[in-house]
Amino acid sequence: MQPIIKGAVSSTFKRALYNFGIKEKKSVNIEMGRTQQTKKIDQSLSKKLPKGTIYDPFDFSMGRIHLDRKYQANKNSNRNDIMKSGANPLEFYARPRILSRYVTSTGRIQHRDITGLSAKNQRRLSKAIRRCQAIGLM
């Protein structure tokens, strides 16, 4: 008699599960001759709602997980930058070491979502970076 395999899945499906944080465990019961698979879901993918909470199906979608991760990353950014401390970014046009933190490896100015600056300071920062590039320091 051949062993019964429950939940047999293809390798591409396993990769997709792994990419979404679902890891697969196999346990073999020697006495019964059966292979059982249990799936462990990553906690970042599960949503714990308090009792009596009204929820939307969007709360369980991948889009919601991406939004949560995006805003959590912004909250957790512990960058103690001079820019966030109230200094005027235009004053740093001659300091490429400071301004290079706000430029990508290809030389593009990072977006406000990434820098975490206000709209006003982001404009000032962009102007300072362009000035620094124009005078040849960056």
UniProtKB/Swiss-Prot annotation:
One of its GO terms (cellular component) is mitochondrial small ribosomal subunit. Residues 1-16 form a transit peptide. GO terms for biological process: mitochondrial translation; translation. Component of the mitochondrial ribosome (mitoribosome), a dedicated translation machinery responsible for the synthesis of mitochondrial genome-encoded proteins, including at least some of the essential transmembrane subunits of the mitochondrial respiratory chain. The mitoribosomes are attached to the mitochondrial inner membrane and translation products are cotranslationally integrated into the membrane. Component of the mitochondrial small ribosomal subunit (mt-SSU). Mature yeast 74S mitochondrial ribosomes consist of a small (37S) and a large (54S) subunit. The 37S small subunit contains a 15S ribosomal RNA (15S mt-rRNA) and 34 different proteins. The 54S large subunit contains a 21S rRNA (21S mt-rRNA) and 46 different proteins. Present with 1210 molecules/cell in log phase SD medium. This is Small ribosomal subunit protein bS18m.
